[in-house]
Every structure is written in C-alpha cells, then in structure tokens.
C-alpha cells in the first residue's frame, strides 16, 4: 500500500523547513508521495518552486508534487483556470463561502480544514453532496489537532467527527493530511490512520483516506498534464 501526504507547507509559504528536509523526512516515515502546498504569487514563483522541487527530487526517492492553496474565492477561480500548470488545487477552508465555493468547483482536489476557526464543522448535507459529486476531498488536518489545546482541541475534534459522520452518510471523500509546516510535524501514515479511527472512521476507510483517495488525486493530476487530455473524462486518441 502506498501512502500520501498532500498538504505540507515549506519555507516558501508559511513553513519552517526546506522542501528537501520535508521530502526526506516523509520518505523516512513511509510515504511515497508528498505535495507542497504554497500560496500563488505569479508565474515566476511557480517556476522557481518547480526548480526547487526538481532539485530536491534528485536527492530522494519520494515523488514530490506541487500544490497551490487558494485563500479566497477570487484566488480559487484564478487557480482553477491554470490548474494544468501544477498538480494539486487546495482550497483554504474555514470561511463558509469559501467552503461552499470549494465543493462547487470541480477543479478543487482538497478542501482543507473546513472547520478552521469555526464553532461548527463547516460542512452541511448540501455541501457534502456537492463534495461527492465533484470529487472534492474533505480534509482531516492533523496539525489542527497537534497545535490546539483544551477546549479548542475538544471543539476541533467534535467538528472533525461531524464531518466524518457526514462522509459516512453522503459518501463524500475524506483525506488525511498532516498540514505540517516543519519536517518535525510530519506524522507517519499509520498514526494518521489510528487518529482517524478515534474520530469515528472504520479502519478500511481510514486507510483509504491516506492511500486510495489521495492516489486518485495524483493520478488525475498526471492525466491532466497529458497532451491527450481535454477535460475530465475526455481525451483525444
């Protein structure tokens, strides 16, 4: 079984560690793929990130992907239009309008921490149905738990449980990510699975959330970069 962590921040965004440090640590922990989530600042930044990833790729066996995390609906639309230029499109969750826009947008791969800074889970039954229809994975973010304390952590855990309950009922995809900003915050995949079980996921679905679900996202990213690709589900001969 291959394991993936598709939401990690390097020093290029809000992170503290280099791409190489994070990639090497992820490889040690048993991951086969890691995706660096950055904030889009333009074409020059994108090319610089690709060069840094290529440099780190030569020093590790793990496959390194590039993702961009949209922070508002305007940024989301812009990134959706240029998605073939990178691998994974993430939407920064928390704001209800952003959460809704993310699950309505087919180009979005992951809605990150939809419960962020909220007193509810950030997703309702309508949004859950949209997430399923558009294959938008709802994230369970380990860092949200790791860096919180007391009542805040209790609220976050309760909100994550609510999203897992919605996922069970409406079949929306759930993905487990570390959300790490340092190579010391990366979490091994089996610990992530164990955490998801404690939140109410059955073992099979918890494993899929760190393997099968992200693998589909990676496969879709590779297909999209093919010269034969026209749109999702449509290719030239």
What is the predicted role of each segment?
Residues 1-36, 42-59, 73-86, 97-237:
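Charged catalytic cores and adjacent phosphate/nucleic-acid-binding surfaces used
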Residues 63-74, 92-95:
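A glycine-rich, hydrophobic loop/mini-helix early in the fold
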């Amino acid at each position: 079984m291959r394991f993936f962590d598709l939401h990690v921040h390097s020093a290029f965004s809000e992170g503290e560690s280099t791409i190489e440090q994070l990639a090497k640590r992820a490889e040690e922990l048993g991951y086969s793929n890691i995706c660096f989530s950055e904030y889009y600042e333009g074409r020059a930044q994108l090319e610089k990130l690709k060069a840094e990833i290529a440099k780190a790729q030569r020093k590790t066996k793990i496959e390194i992907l590039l993702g961009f995390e949209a922070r508002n609906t305007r940024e989301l639309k812009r990134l959706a239009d240029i998605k073939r230029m990178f691998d994974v499109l993430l939407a920064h969750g928390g704001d209800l309008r952003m959460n809704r826009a993310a699950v309505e947008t087919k180009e979005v791969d992951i809605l990150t921490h939809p419960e962020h800074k909220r007193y509810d889970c950030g997703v309702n039954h309508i949004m859950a149905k949209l997430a399923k229809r558009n294959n938008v994975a709802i994230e369970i973010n380990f860092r949200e738990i790791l860096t919180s304390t007391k009542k805040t952590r209790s609220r976050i855990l309760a909100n994550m449980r609510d999203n897992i309950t919605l996922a069970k009922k409406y079949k929306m995809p759930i993905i487990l990510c570390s959300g790490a900003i340092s190579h010391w915050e990366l979490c091994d995949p089996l610990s992530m699975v164990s955490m998801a079980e404690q939140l109410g996921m059955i073992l099979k679905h918890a494993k899929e959330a760190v393997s099968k679900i992200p693998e589909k996202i990676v496969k879709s990213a590779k297909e999209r970069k093919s010269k034969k690709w026209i749109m999702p589900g449509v290719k030239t001969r």
